[in-house]
């Protein structure tokens, strides 16, 4: 009994609280952590952009010299490292944590506490095996993928990232378990640990490696012992090593997150007092439990896999189409980007431009992911509540949970998305301070604002479908939507005047279909009709007013204090402050929420 006294958290008592209270509390905890994580992630990209920009040299041109830097190239390599990783990581961890969360929540609602323990026991060996296999597959796949996208400099970063899939599987053993108990605190802490190490250790390693690489090349003409005759290739090699250092911060962060979970579980136990086990029915057999986990996990994992593979194909198409465009019709891109790339890059060094343009897309994508990450939190927090209400057959609680998720999602998403559209160019200019990224990324972010609305809404909608037991529906929906996305992306990116910006159009249409059809299916199968008008229209009106005020305030400030980087920061701060005040005022006038 002495061990029980060390427990500071009672999972059963928490599960018996009002669903809306636990949802709001869980969402608040995860939202706070996610904001910290995404701010750290944004700072990481800002710092890395500065580091990669520092890897530069002066090149003689007609009438003088110009600086050649590798900021967008470095961001492109950084993004490429994630592409194949995301697919394999999703297969390894995409379905099982959600399955464990749902089954733990369901078993707790049914007071089958021995099943809760059995679920945890059965998941451990399975996750370990999956993690080791996924790590080995990722290492092998990295060598193939760099050949497909013709980006050999991406390989080192991919290899440094590969251990993360193993640690991610080990973390998932505990993350799904705690989330199923409506305890979001461990997830929040572990994510902050990962983000902190990624930011500080990763940036430190990237800087040191870039600094040592440039010194090595200046003194001996070699990069860490490698003789490279061409100066551009030498600096690209330095950037690839620097990117690998930054990615090592991610791997170390995931390892530290796993250590945190191990220590927490050993010190505090599983959160279920011993008397609940004694009074519970006997647990299902390990085989039955394992089959139940797989039955729930496979459709979820397949849906996530389809999304990831679709995105991977999408990314390959974008880069291959851009590369083909450079090789067959360089004049079309040169007319648009001649001030950012030397003539040799369009005709001789053709493997740099498509990676750099992809880096611009990746830079803008960071802001969409900031919003969708928060709404994904709403979906994760809603899952146990929706599952519990559905299991109990409590229609009122289910309706309340669904409406709360929609309301919070729209309340957060609308102002963020429209604000990004209104301030796209100054945001990119301030954050990255690179002419190419500001120009191309600003145009992408402008379109991406609409994409953000549907992308942010689709995740919690699919989570709620899984919560009511229809884990198969998101998978089917993802399959159709990814096919649409690939076709639209190919069509738009192939137009030289649109090029990389076309990837955003495909995403926008895909997420719109996913959200609208997903909501229809949720209403159909839950037999619940949420108040969509009341939960969406008022936040939209407030967001339009706030975005308009932000746009006006920024340009007024710009006309007064100019457009230097510090001036942009001041103008953005003032415009965002004005937008927040206007948004709150409009919501109060409209009495939202009632």
Please name every model-derived segment.
Residues 1-43, 114, 118, 280-300, ...:
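N-terminal membrane topogenesis motif
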Residues 2-10, 554-594:
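Membrane-proximal transmembrane or re-entrant/amphipathic helices at the cytosolic face
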Residues 18-98, 135, 165, 299, ...:
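Signature of the first transmembrane helix
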Residues 37, 93-98, 160-179, 187-195, ...:
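Short runs within selected transmembrane alpha-helices of multi-pass transporters and secretion channels
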Residues 62-66, 74-93, 331-350, 354-375, ...:
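Alpha-helical transmembrane segments of polytopic membrane transporters and translocases
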Residues 94-109, 364, 375-392:
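Helix-loop junctions and terminal segments of transmembrane helices
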Residues 143-161, 403, 420-452, 562-566:
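Interfacial segments at transmembrane-helix termini and the short loops linking adjacent helices
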Residues 185, 196-259, 472, 482-516, ...:
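Membrane-interface helix-loop junctions in multi-pass transport and translocation proteins
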């Amino acid at each position: 009994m002495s061990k029980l006294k060390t427990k500071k958290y009672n999972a059963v008592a928490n599960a018996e609280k009002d669903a809306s209270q636990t949802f709001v509390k869980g969402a608040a905890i995860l939202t706070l952590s996610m904001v910290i994580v995404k701010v750290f992630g944004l700072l990481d990209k800002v710092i890395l952009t500065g580091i990669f920009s520092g890897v530069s040299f002066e090149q003689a041109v007609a009438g003088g010299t110009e600086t050649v830097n590798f900021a967008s190239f470095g961001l492109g390599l950084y993004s490429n490292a994630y592409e194949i990783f995301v697919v394999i990581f999703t297969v390894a961890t995409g379905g099982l944590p959600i399955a464990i969360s749902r089954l733990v929540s369901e078993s707790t609602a049914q007071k089958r506490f021995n099943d809760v323990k059995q679920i945890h026991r059965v998941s451990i060996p399975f996750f370990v095996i999956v993690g080791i296999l996924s790590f080995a597959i990722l290492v092998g796949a990295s060598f193939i993928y760099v050949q497909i996208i013709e980006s050999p400099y991406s390989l080192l970063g991919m290899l440094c990232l590969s251990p993360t899939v193993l640690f991610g599987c080990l973390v998932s053993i505990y993350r799904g378990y705690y989330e199923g108990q409506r305890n979001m605190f461990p997830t929040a802490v572990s994510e902050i640990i990962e983000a902190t190490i990624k930011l500080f250790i990763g940036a430190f390693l990237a800087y040191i490696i870039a600094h040592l690489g440039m010194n090595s090349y200046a003194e001996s003409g070699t990069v860490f012992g490698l003789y490279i005759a061409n100066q551009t290739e030498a600096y690209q090699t330095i950037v690839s090593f620097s990117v690998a250092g930054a990615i090592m911060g991610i791997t170390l962060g995931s390892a530290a997150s796993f250590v945190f979970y191990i220590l927490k579980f050993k010190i505090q136990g599983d959160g279920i007092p011993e008397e609940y086990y004694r009074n519970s029915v006997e647990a299902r057999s390990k085989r039955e439990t394992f089959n139940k986990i797989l039955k729930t996990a496979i459709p979820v994992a397949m849906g996530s896999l389809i999304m990831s593979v679709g995105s991977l194909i999408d990314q390959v198409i974008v880069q291959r189409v851009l590369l083909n465009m450079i090789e067959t019709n360089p004049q079309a891109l040169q007319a648009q980007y001649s001030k950012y790339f030397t003539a040799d890059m369009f005709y001789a060094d053709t493997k740099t431009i498509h990676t750099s343009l992809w880096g611009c897309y990746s830079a803008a994508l960071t802001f969409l992911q900031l919003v969708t990450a928060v709404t994904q939190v709403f979906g994760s927090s809603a899952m146990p509540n929706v599952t519990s209400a559905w299991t109990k057959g409590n229609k009122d609680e289910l309706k309340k949970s669904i409406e709360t998720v929609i309301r919070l999602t729209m309340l957060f998403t609308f102002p963020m998305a429209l604000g990004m559209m209104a301030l796209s160019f100054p945001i990119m200019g301030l954050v990255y301070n690179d002419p190419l990224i500001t120009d191309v990324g600003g145009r992408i972010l402008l379109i991406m604002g609409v994409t953000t609305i549907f992308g942010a809404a689709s995740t919690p909608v699919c989570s709620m479908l899984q919560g009511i037991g229809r884990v198969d529906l998101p998978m089917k929906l993802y399959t159709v939507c990814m096919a649409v996305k690939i076709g639209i992306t190919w069509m738009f990116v192939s137009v030289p005047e649109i090029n990389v910006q076309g990837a955003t159009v495909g995403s926008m249409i895909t997420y719109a279909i996913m959200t609208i059809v997903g909501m229809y299916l949720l209403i159909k199968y839950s037999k619940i009709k949420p108040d969509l008008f009341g939960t969406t229209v008022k936040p939209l009106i407030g967001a339009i007013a706030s975005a308009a005020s932000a746009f006006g305030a920024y340009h007024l400030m710009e006309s007064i204090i100019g457009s230097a980087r510090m001036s942009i920061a001041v103008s953005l701060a003032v415009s965002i402050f004005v937008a927040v005040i206007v948004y709150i005022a409009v919501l109060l006038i409209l009495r939202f929420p009632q």
